Design a protein with these regions (language model features):
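Divalent-metal-activated hydrolytic enzyme cores
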Residues: 30-74, 98-99, 108-126, 143-226
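Short, glycine/acidic-enriched capping/hinge loops at junctions between secondary-structure elements
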Residues: 89-94, 115
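Short glycine-enriched loops at secondary-structure junctions
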Residues: 82-87, 107-110, 136
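N-terminal secretory signal peptides that target proteins for export/translocation
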Residues: 1-11
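Short acidic/polar active-site loop segments enriched in Thr and Asp
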Residues: 129
Length: 226
């Protein structure tokens, strides 16, 4: 006997699988193929939205907007690439609500191919015009990488942070703190060279920002912006 799905169930399945289908298309798309994405806020407007939210958060005046669950189509103002550290929750530190941020997190706020495809999906399919790479004080991944550098036997995650350590070796200040900022800067610069993202950066449709989060104050400091 054939399996029949109610129209509501079928619609939910189609909605849930759409992002997966897009990522598969993106992975095998010919070079130069572009995708039409809905228009969202400009890079400057999106960045200001998040900086205003962080100012509310640090002033203990968070409004917690749009905190209820939603099944509406998503139109995030920004992609956040941040560390998995539990003390760095993007929606809270930016005082944003459900649907406001497209968040990709891993230890050390670097990325691999799978994370990159998620970022490309947000920019190419959802129309997101801003990417913020967030490093933070006391990052355990960077601390571990500094301790392991330059051992070739370190994990791939730690090796991803090695370029930041190499770039800051011998500079004044704390080696770990220096590497934390440099790691965010280099990750943002690497994203800006991605074949799917670089044309949008060049045209001004996309801005990629490196930032650092202060665990004690809750404040975000912009390091660089492409």
């Amino acid at each position: 006997m054939g399996l029949k799905l109610k129209s509501s169930v079928r619609a939910k399945l189609i909605y849930a699988l759409a992002p997966i289908a897009f990522l598969a298309t993106l992975a095998f798309a010919p070079a130069g193929l572009s995708f039409e994405a809905p228009a969202g806020p400009s890079p400057a407007a999106a960045l200001q939205q998040l900086l205003d939210g962080n100012a509310r958060y640090t002033a203990d005046k968070a409004t917690h907007p749009d905190s209820r669950p939603s099944d509406a189509a998503q139109h995030p103002a920004a992609v956040i690439l941040s560390c998995s550290d539990s003390r760095v929750p993007p929606e809270i530190l930016f005082d944003q609500g459900v649907g406001s941020l497209f968040v990709v997190r891993d230890a050390g706020n670097t990325y691999d191919q799978l994370a990159l495809e998620s970022i490309e999906y947000a920019v190419g399919h959802l129309g997101t015009s801003l990417i913020i790479v967030i490093g933070h004080d006391q990052c355990g991944a960077v601390t571990a990488a500094v301790g392991e550098y330059p051992k070739p036997t370190a994990s791939p995650m730690l090796k991803n942070i090695y370029p930041a350590i190499a770039s800051t070796r011998g500079k004044p200040g704390d080696p770990v703190s220096n590497a934390i900022s440099e790691n965010a800067i280099l990750t943002a610069a690497r994203l800006a060279k991605d074949p799917h993202l670089a044309p949008k950066v060049a045209s001004g449709q996309l801005r990629i920002v490196a930032a650092r989060y202060n665990l004690a104050s809750g404040a975000l400091t912009i390091l660089t912006a492409k």
